[in-house]
Amino acid sequence: MQTIIRVEKLAKTFNQHQALHAVDLNIHHGEMVALLGPSGSGKSTLLRHLSGLIVGDKKPECRVELLGCTVQQNGRLARDIRKSRANTGYIFQQFNLVNRLSVLENVLIGALGSTPFWRTCFSWFTREQKQRALQALTRVGMVHFAHQRVSTLSGGQQQRVAIARALMQQAKVILADEPIASLDPESARIVMDTLRDINQNDGITVVVTLHQVDYALRYCERIVALRQGHVFYDGSSQLFDNDRFDHLYRSINRVEENAKAA
């Protein structure tokens, strides 16, 4: 099975606090993987390293690869990082859309990496690009809102526009950082259904950070759980039982309660 993401001995320190401890991780083509863990466990930090949004500690053994290309090593981004980012769709918790633009214009932003610079200056997109953008919106059930300003949409609708933008980008990997954290249950279900549909029918590898364990169990075949910057569990979601859940979350809560009491 083809390895899409490879992480070797990744460590990250923020202000003398070790956020990640020598993390090793391999993610294969077509997987949908949930990154779980309490707040501060390092799951979002790990996800940001995968696309090179942040770099790890300056250690020769620290390395991140995506689609066979180096993203970062020894605390430095690869010179051809733009190539890796072009293949990676990143979905943020707060959508990261341009409110003053229409839904269609926001989706077309996904084509900037493959559009000549002079065209981007004037927002001159080809008919074929506009057609692909409409197809992406159809895929996520948002084509009827194509010419509506994105600021008028609900949170769940905006997140689906962000997914359409990743499709427009023709990303081979989608990294989603807490994509349903601020959504109501029905909107969260629709967003997760959309990600699973893209994963299963397009073969796009999806890595998603979640706080909601029930969604991870329902939508992802594999769970990678982090605890205080260490990989605590990496395996089938079917084997992530109550004992593991208790050790991952409740022991952390007890430590926090004891600290407050002290």
Curated annotation (Swiss-Prot):
The gene is phnC. Disulfide bonds: none annotated. It is found in: Cell inner membrane. It is a peripheral membrane protein. InterPro entries: AAA+_ATPase (IPR003593), ABC_transporter-like_ATP-bd (IPR003439), ABC_transporter-like_CS (IPR017871), ABC_transpr_PhnC (IPR012693), MetN_ABC_transporter-like (IPR050086), P-loop_NTPase (IPR027417). This is Phosphonates import ATP-binding protein PhnC. Residues 5-253 form the ABC transporter domain. PROSITE patterns: ABC_TRANSPORTER_1 (PS00211), ABC_TRANSPORTER_2 (PS50893), PHNC (PS51249). The complex is composed of two ATP-binding proteins (PhnC), two transmembrane proteins (PhnE) and a solute-binding protein (PhnD). It catalyses: phosphonate(out) + ATP + H2O = phosphonate(in) + ADP + phosphate + H(+). PANTHER family: AMINO ACID IMPORT ATP-BINDING PROTEIN, PHOSPHONATES IMPORT ATP-BINDING PROTEIN PHNC. Its EC number is 7.3.2.2. Pfam families: ABC_tran. Keywords: ATP-binding, Cell inner membrane, Cell membrane, Membrane, Nucleotide-binding, Phosphonate transport, Translocase, Transport. GO terms for cellular component: plasma membrane. It is an enzyme of class 7 (translocase). Part of the ABC transporter complex PhnCDE involved in phosphonates import. Responsible for energy coupling to the transport system. Belongs to the ABC transporter superfamily. Phosphonates importer (TC 3.A.1.9.1) family. One of its GO terms (molecular function) is ATP hydrolysis activity.
